[in-house]
Amino acid sequence: MSFSSRSIGGYGGMSTRLGRGSASVYEGGGSSGGYRISQSSMGGGGGYGGGYGGGGGYRGGGGYGGGCAISSSFQSFGAFRGGGAGGGGLSGGNEKAEMQGLNDRLAEYIEKVRFLENANQELELRIKELLKGKGPGNKDYSAYYTTMQELRDKILAQIMENARVSLEIDNARLAADDFRSKWETELALRSSVEADINNLRGLLDEYSMARMGLEGEIESLREELIFMRKNHEEELAALRAQLEGSSMSVEVDSTKGKDLHKILAEVRAQYEAMIAKNRVDQEEAFNKQAQSVQVVAVQHSQASQAAKVEVTETRRAMQSLQAELDSLRGLIRSLEDQLQDTEERNARDLSTYTMQIQRLEGELSNLRHGINQQLKEYADLLNMKMKLEAEIATYRRLLEGEDSRMGNISANSTSGLITVSGGGGGGGGGVSGGGGGGGMSMTMTSSSSSGGGGGSSSSGGGSVVKTTTTKESSSYSTGYRS
């Protein structure tokens, strides 16, 4: 339902403009000598202010003056409560109640739509700011690329260094294995030489024992020769003594004496030949054995000297190889320590970079989740807005139909009741006067509104102004009501 702007002449040049507005509760706050009226500024210097939210209202504060300018915007056909002593209103039927409920719902919807539009704008601004500040497309990763490239270069350098160290370790291990094989070969050769020396020492002991045995035999043969010579000399002496004792029968036994000397000479010759032969044989055998033993001893001594020299050289080579092996082992240990330190450092760096990447991925995931959540909320709000706009369009069509119907009625006549009472008072919503002493409280009701009891006036009687408005002109009549 809509009211066109009409002038209501009369009190203090007061003019009233009625139209469609928001479904709100209006209060006018007056001071001494002013008026309280909804959406109005009474008198000179009157103010108009409002607070919107939760079905909020507009507050108008009147000042001092004789005139009153009233500008009202009706959206709802709610209850108006007057603050006069005898304030009253008109009540309609079920149609008015339904229209009042529809107006209340429409006011709530409009308020909700405005709130959602503001929230939608705020969300759009926040989304734009987030997309500008934290969007994946606008973020600059060039610094990270440089750092990552440097780290890749370092990692490649460390990999090459590890490969070089591993190659050196393998070469050192191969050299150590080669030296170990050489050392084992020399050790086996030394063992064989020592075994040969031990065998030669056994042979030398055997030859020494044989030499000692031969020397004992030579001594025994010499003693036997001396004993035989002594016996021979004794026998010769005995025979000479016998010959001297039997000198008287020399002539008789001369032939036998010759035979005895001959026999003795032959025996002596035989024994001397045997002794000489045995001596020569023994000397030859001894010389042969001594020469063979000397040759063997010389050979063994030469072999022993060569073995000693070889053992000395082998020992010297083994010592040098052992020193080189120790140095290589120390180098391997140091390289292994360096490799372990490098691996630990690379593992720490890799763990740090992995944590940074995970943190950045988490932030990116949270950002995407927040954007998706806000987009979802935006879509929900947009759907709600569309639903509310559809309902508002429906209510607008209903109201336009009601306005057209009421316009036809108001073409003939439209009546309203203005109640003016002195003093302030009037509680509740609507248009209510509540000024101080000596003021005026005005309540305006239309034919489609229902008035309820409100406050109480602080002073005496008031006046009731009943206005009947037509299209062409407007007039009012005033009557006094006790």
Curated annotation (Swiss-Prot):
Keywords per UniProt: Coiled coil, Intermediate filament, Keratin
UniProt xrefs under PANTHER family: INTERMEDIATE FILAMENT, KERATIN, TYPE I CYTOSKELETAL 15-LIKE
InterPro entries: IF_conserved, IF_rod_dom, Keratin_I
Compositional bias segments (type: Low complexity): 464-482
Residue stretches making up the IF rod domain: 95-406
Annotated spans, Coil 1A: 95-130
Additional notes on this entry: There are two types of cytoskeletal and microfibrillar keratin, I (acidic) and II (neutral to basic) (40-55 and 56-70 kDa, respectively).
Span list, region Tail: 403-479
Region annotation Head: where it falls in the sequence: 1-94
Stretches for region Coil 2: 264-402
Positions of region (Linker 1): 131-147
Region described as Linker 12: spans on this chain: 240-263
Pfam families hit by this protein: Filament
Quaternary structure and interacting proteins, as annotated: Heterotetramer of two type I and two type II keratins.
GO cellular component, one term: intermediate filament
Protein name stated in the entry: Keratin, type 1 cytoskeletal 11
Family: Belongs to the intermediate filament family.
Gene3D superfamilies to which the protein is assigned, alphabetical: 1.20.5.170, Single helix bin, Vasodilator-stimulated phosphoprotein
